[in-house]
Regions:
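N-terminal Lys/Arg-rich, disordered targeting/topogenic segments
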Residues: 1-13
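Hydrophobic membrane-insertion alpha-helices, especially the h-region
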Residues: 20-35
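Leucine-rich repeat
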Residues: 89-95, 114-120, 137-144, 161-168, ...
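The leucine-rich repeat
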Residues: 107-108, 129-132, 153-156, 177-180, ...
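Hydrophobic anchor residues at the C-terminal helix/turn of individual leucine-rich repeat
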Residues: 109-112, 133-136, 157-160, 181-184, ...
Length: 243
């Protein structure tokens, strides 16, 4: 090969490889930007739906502990000029959602399903039903579920299997009975269970004792007897039992 041709060919090959690398990187960046824009639009729409239902949300920078939020919280991520330019939805993640005791609404159900970063979900009154739990999609991020004074029954507890990492579950003032307690065996990470003012009785002791990671259970206002509570303490000596 002519000595003058070889360097030119080498430069051409380097240019081709550099151009190919540039195109690959540009394609990846474009794909990421499109995904980020879609996620931001989805979160913005979800927030609007929740707020229109008189619901409340908190963001990741509000978290001050595993299940505590402080306001205004830590400084949100990202430089302020870029947040102003793009919008907070590109940086912030919703980690807490609370919905009031209104009837089940498809808009807010979709909104919650569109927020995969939610760690704690609170459904009050009519917003917490067997049907609403059935329509919530599977989430490995959800750690806490509060269903205070909701319409949840034994049938609804079957859907808790969709939340395998659930650590805190509140079922006080619900329709839950002994028949539904067996469904809790699917929650191997459960640490705290609030059953106050339900119809749970001593018949649920085997199901409760089977929750190996459980650290606290509140049985006040239930049909569990003092003898039954003592049996739980004997079978699970590290479990704090409130009765």
């Amino acid at each position: 090969m002519n000595k003058s041709v070889a360097p030119a060919l080498s430069r051409l090959l380097r240019f081709r490889y550099s151009l190919r690398t540039f195109l690959i990187v540009a394609t990846l960046i474009s794909a990421w930007l499109a995904w980020a824009a879609h996620r931001a639009r989805t979160q913005r729409s979800a927030l609007e739906a929740i707020q229109s239902a008189d619901g409340a949300v908190s963001f990741d920078y509000h978290e001050s502990g595993p299940r505590t939020w402080s306001y205004p919280g830590r400084p949100p991520r990202g430089p302020q000029w870029l947040r102003n330019l793009l919008g907070p939805q590109y940086f912030d993640r919703v980690t807490f959602v609370s919905l009031p005791g209104t009837a089940v609404d498809e808009k807010w159900l979709k909104a919650v399903n569109d927020l995969p970063s939610v760690k704690w979900l609170r459904l009050w009154g009519h917003s917490g039903t067997d049907a609403s739990l059935a329509r919530l999609r599977k989430s490995t991020a959800l750690l806490g579920l509060q269903l205070t004074s909701s319409k949840i029954s034994d049938a609804g507890l079957e859907h808790l299997a969709k939340f395998p990492n659930l650590r805190w579950l509140t079922l006080n003032n619900t329709r839950v009975t002994d028949s539904g307690m067996a469904h809790l065996s699917q929650l191997g990470s459960l640490e705290e269970l609030i059953l106050t003012n339900t119809k749970v009785s001593d018949a649920s002791i085997p199901a409760i004792a089977g929750l190996r990671k459980l650290q606290l259970i509140d049985l006040r206002g239930t049909q569990v007897t003092e003898r039954g509570a003592q049996r739980i303490r004997e079978q699970a000596p590290n479990l704090k039992v409130l009765r």
